[in-house]
């Protein structure tokens, strides 16, 4: 916010030439709802950038396809002294479900364009257990495979323990913006020019995550993401420097200048 507002202050104070500019801040990005109710016609822009990336000089226009899955296991509790061939321990079935997923497709074992299953939460007892996953992949077909795999595991366990033992609910979250950015690649080309004018080398890597720009792009507002200059996001060591924030503001001003010509 500070980088964007500082750029706006400089434009107003110095009277720099610019076209129509639209500025907005979305409050719920970190829970995946930042752009779900965003009023694109009311916003009034044809193209946009989000400022939500990593190191200053970064341009992100390819991100994960994303889904979330909730796995619910229904057990059958009886006295453990007479449980043989009768008890279905929901917590054990939950561990069996998770154990059926590939170990090398977890966040801690993947990088680059490799997708993953991420177990975010789990809890349970003998009668009921729940697993919460997020699924990620840059390739939409590979994400679909991951979703199908969860259903196949559920089918196998239901065949083993009885129908209805395992239920899987899957909800799509966001999609890779690349398809929507390609027809408007001037956004990337002009961002490159703006970064180079600021004395930096553009860095373009697929995002191992998502941004509101992905949702906005699929809703009709092409919107790549720019670096903020921050580090160690989503942790107690998250930080940035004033110098990097100044550079991020300089890049925004350069973009405005490029589009004003």
What are these regions (language model features)?
Residues 92-109, 116-118, 165, 175-223:
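Active-site-adjacent substrate-binding region
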Residues 67, 119-132, 153, 157-169, ...:
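A glycine-rich, aromatic-flanked flexible loop/lid motif
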Residues 1-64, 106, 110, 114-120, ...:
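Acidic/histidine-rich catalytic neighborhood of metal-dependent amide-processing enzymes
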Residues 1-29, 69-73, 79-80, 84-104, ...:
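Alpha-helical metal-binding/catalytic segments enriched in His/Glu/Asp
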Residues 21-22, 45-49, 69-70, 203, ...:
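Structural motif
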Residues 125-127, 202-251, 256-259:
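Zn-dependent metallopeptidase/amidohydrolase metal-coordination segment
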Residues 61, 83-121, 141-167:
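Acidic-enriched catalytic cores of C-N bond-cleaving enzymes acting on peptides and small amides
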Residues 73, 129-137, 170-177:
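Short, hydrophobic beta-strand segments
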């Amino acid at each position: 916010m500070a980088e964007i507002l500082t750029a706006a202050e400089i434009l107003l104070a110095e009277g720099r030439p610019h076209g129509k500019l639209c500025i907005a801040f979305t409050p719920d990005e970190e829970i995946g709802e930042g752009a779900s109710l965003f009023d694109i016609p009311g916003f009034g822009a044809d193209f946009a950038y989000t400022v939500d990336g990593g190191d200053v000089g970064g341009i992100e226009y390819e991100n994960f396809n994303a889904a979330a899955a909730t796995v619910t296991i229904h057990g059958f509790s009886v006295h453990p002294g007479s449980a043989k061939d009768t008890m279905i321990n929901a917590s054990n079935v939950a561990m069996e479900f998770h154990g059926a997923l590939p170990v090398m497709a977890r966040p801690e074992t993947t990088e680059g364009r490799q997708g993953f299953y991420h177990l975010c939460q789990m809890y349970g007892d003998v009668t009921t257990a729940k697993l919460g996953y997020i699924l990620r992949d840059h390739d939409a077909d590979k994400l679909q495979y991951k979703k199908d795999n969860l259903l196949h595991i559920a089918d196998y366990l239901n065949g083993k323990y009885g129908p209805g033992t395992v239920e899987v609910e899957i909800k799509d979250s966001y999609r890779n913006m690349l398809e929507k950015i390609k027809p408007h690649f001037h956004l990337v080309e002009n961002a490159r020019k703006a970064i180079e004018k600021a004395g930096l080398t553009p860095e373009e890597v697929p995002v191992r995550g998502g941004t509101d720009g992905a949702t906005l792009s699929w809703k009709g507002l092409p919107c790549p993401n720019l670096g903020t200059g921050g580090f160690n996001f989503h942790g107690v060591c998250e930080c940035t420097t004033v110098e990097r924030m100044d550079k991020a503001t300089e890049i925004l001003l350069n973009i405005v200048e490029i589009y004003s010509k």
